[in-house]
Amino acid sequence: AMSGFVIGNKTIYKNLHSLKAGEIVIFQGNSYEYLQYYKYFGEIINKSFEDYLKELSEVTLNIFRKMLNKIGDRQIIIPLSAGNDSRLVASILKHLGAKNVKCYSYGTPENFEVKIAKIISQKLDYEWKLIPLTHKSEKIFYASKDYKKYLDYSETYCSVPYIQSLSTVKYLKNINWINDDAIFINGNTGDFISGGHINLNILDASKLENIEFRKENILSQLIEKHFSLWGYLKTDLNKNNLKVNLWNEIVEGCSDIQKNSNDHLLYEYSEFIDRQSKYVISGQRIYEYYGYNWRLPLWNDEYLLFWQKVPLNYKLKQKLYIEMLKKNNFGNVWGDDIPVNKKKIT
């Protein structure tokens, strides 16, 4: 209840367990064993900022180029906001020559996200549609049978269903604005993978040698950001129980815990294995529910392998990511004349 997702391989049922991200089960006769074939935790490689900037540009272009080659002429639908990630998707597709692309946004016409998304779409020469949402329209939708059917469809027993944009995809389908074989591509989850969730306190604490102090700092940051949905549940008892479970999961999955340069990796590993893979990614089920395919280029294997080796000082405040976007200026939509939404890291 404090987060909307479970920790580890637990579910809401006592004797039912799930696989964690990057994990398989191998059965042999009457026995079985869990094997983690991938973890978002790597060896930090120290290179110059310029070298990393060049590599990130190449990796990003390569990922989208290969994806576009496989998609071919199929229609691409982009949920576009004023943030970096969906703008990257739209602008790099334009840079690579993709033509069969539509963008949409939702909310009120005077919303900052909507205004900027419209400007971006116009500059890229991509068709754009606003889906106006009101309290009344959303109240009607969330009381509908369709919404209840989606809850059953998307149940995983380890996370609450992701429902943001559910009504908007249905709206677009109902007005026949989307081809039946269209592919949705959103920006999940560029902000996390590029360092946008790392608090400056992680940097300050990582300069210390005391593992207990650093451990407490990492766990406190995780709880503050991801386990604070209900303030009245943040009792000392609940927080202490959370810390034990979170730290056990980190110790089980990560090596070199004593190394203070790995503090941000421990923090990101925990978010990756729980919140990102259980809750955030489940939002893709929305597209599946209405019969559409999707792609997640910013979760591509190449991106994971790249970002897990980047030093902390290049990831703080998304320094490397943002510099790459501005330097390449895909689609000419990365100037100061088209502002990015402001997000506060807590």
Indicate where each model-derived feature is located.
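Cysteine-centered catalytic environments shared across enzyme families
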Residues: 1-80, 84-136
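Generic recognition of stable, solvent-exposed alpha-helical segments in well-folded globular domains
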Residues: 20, 51, 55-59, 84, ...
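Short, solvent-exposed loop/turn segments at secondary-structure junctions
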Residues: 84-85, 109-111, 135-138, 188-193, ...
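Short secondary-structure boundary/capping segments
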Residues: 96, 120, 145-149, 195-214, ...
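A conserved beta-strand->alpha-helix junction
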Residues: 114, 118-154, 243, 249, ...
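Extended catalytic-interface subdomain
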Residues: 143-201
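Conserved glycine-rich, hydrophobic/aromatic-active-site segments
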Residues: 211-342
